[in-house]
Amino acid sequence: MAELKNDRYLRALLKQPVDMTPVWMMRQAGRYLPEYKATRAQAGDFMSLCKNHELACEVTLQPLRRYELDAAILFSDILTVPDAMGLGLYFEAGEGPRFERPTDTIDAIKKLAVPDPEDDLGYVMKAVSTIRRELNGQVPLIGFSGSPWTLATYMVEGGSSKTFEKIKKMAYAEPAALHMLLDKLADSVTLYLNAQVANGAQSLMIFDSWGGALSHTAYREFSLRYMQKIVDGLTRFADGRQVPVTLFTKGGGLWLEAMAETGCDALGLDWTVDIADARRRVGHKVALQGNMDPSMLYAPIPRIEEEVAQILAGYGEGTGHVFNLGHGIHQHVDPEHAGAFIKAVHAQSKQYHK
């Protein structure tokens, strides 16, 4: 494997000194880029794009050609794991992801097998190894998965949900069934992430997009407990260096202390969290990633620069901060505004790393 030329992102996650704050964007390979739209049209549909390792590699690299980003993230989807479990994933126009065969009964859950990542998810592994090769040491490659709770919400609900009625009914009326599902998912995600590392991923992120829908105690029981199980089972060293792990619960600002106890290296913050407060609470234990509101990229460029300055000042001096948005970049953002954001982070952060 080629020597890593820019390891700023990995160093910041491990709280090692850096020359400036590293930056990348969730969904940086996405619909706001005209070149992404062209490649997606070539693929035919979203899952065909995910399943073609050459095209998945192409869209992963597209934002790096435009911007001086400090990391690449695998182009894939969190629902690859449930799809490999045989649920029949498809995308409904305007509806988002749906499953032909939801796992909303204990019998359906019992029948689920843990997928073999090299076999059932071989297309993802091929994408990881292709991207790692093509990056040629330019920046590190982030591998990722959804959290067990978040994957379970789609599997039980049969797709996206605003109320999470079916999975919450299962959580409170049939908790043993849900725990069985979450346990299988934790095993599946651990194998999946370790296979990504074996194929070249240099950092890992677990997206708990719907953890914030849970009550205080239910979050620990149904989400955090299973992320903890995954963290305990992950490969944390490869290619002669540490593989940092970031946990991100959207809406999880209440639970930063509990998340920091898992042994992860970093926590992702959404835009509802004050980064200065987060650093006071958990900065002694973990690095922090975030956390500009993605909608701020619609603002005039001087306003974006002002917001960047505010977040950098909030975090303050020293390493342990990876700048990012508080969630994925929106599809209608002007690519020039994204570029101005990235430049602002690099230019304005040097003063905090002297």
From Swiss-Prot:
Gene Ontology BP, a term: protoporphyrinogen IX biosynthetic process from glutamate
EC number(s) given by UniProt: 4.1.1.37
GO molecular function list: uroporphyrinogen decarboxylase activity
Keywords noted in UniProt: Cytoplasm, Decarboxylase, Lyase, Porphyrin biosynthesis
Entry GO CC: cytosol
Gene3D superfamilies: 3.20.20.210
Site annotation Transition state stabilizer: residues: 77
InterPro entries in alphabetical order: UROD/MetE-like_sf, Uroporphyrinogen_deCO2ase_HemE, Uroporphyrinogen_deCOase
Principal subcellular localisation of the protein: cytoplasm
Cell location: Cytoplasm
Binding site for substrate: 27-31, 77, 154, 209, 327
Pfam families: URO-D
EC top class, as a word: lyase
Pathway the protein acts in: Porphyrin-containing compound metabolism; protoporphyrin-IX biosynthesis; coproporphyrinogen-III from 5-aminolevulinate: step 4/4
Keyword Endoplasmic reticulum appears in the UniProt entry: no
Catalytic activity from the UniProt record: uroporphyrinogen III + 4 H(+) = coproporphyrinogen III + 4 CO2
Family to which the UniProt record says this protein belongs: Belongs to the uroporphyrinogen decarboxylase family.
Entry function: Catalyzes the decarboxylation of four acetate groups of uroporphyrinogen-III to yield coproporphyrinogen-III.
Assembly and oligomerization: Homodimer.
PANTHER family referenced in this protein's UniProt entry, alphabetically: METHYLTETRAHYDROFOLATE:HOMOCYSTEINE METHYLTRANSFERASE RELATED, UROPORPHYRINOGEN DECARBOXYLASE
Protein name as annotated: Uroporphyrinogen decarboxylase
Organism: Shewanella sp. (strain ANA-3)
